[in-house]
Amino acid sequence: MVTEKKMVSEKEKMVKLIFTYGTLKQGFSNHVLLQDLITTGDALFIGNYKTHLNYPLVCGPYRVPFLINLPGSGQKVIGELYAVSSSGLSRLDELEGITRSHYQRLPIQLSPLDHQDDDDDGVVLTAGEAYFAHSSYAGKLWNKNGRQGLVGYTEEVARGYVKRKDRPQDRTFMDHIRSFLESQ
């Protein structure tokens, strides 16, 4: 039985709200990391959310999903919101290659998925952060996808996704990005 005191202390150590839109979501390959973080008390599932503004969500090499920091373009993106501890945030940052310029963790405004877009009365926006494609290649990735964004990363969209361990190991993530962007 979880006591109220334990729940309060777990919530107190959560330092960031992280919006996940791709392989970290339930049912996808990298969700195992969030499951581990939940088990250790370093993450807590908050709920299903969507971006308040439109953003481009596209797939890159190996069907890897990327959110692009171009507010007003694309569509409102559906995902999941998690509260994470500083330790959990470090593990997510490592997965997303923050120090290697794979992704950037940036602020984003969110609303509950069940909120009606035509009803702005009384909506409380939630300030979180999301992992966006790094600005060094994001614009080119948007163009490569014909400036067409997705609403969500679904099983159908993810069909053909290749896990990191199954990709060529003699090339870096950025090598894969460059090759994808240069391909016809």
Regions found by a protein language model. Give the residues of each.
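Glycine-aromatic micro-motifs
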Residues: 2-184
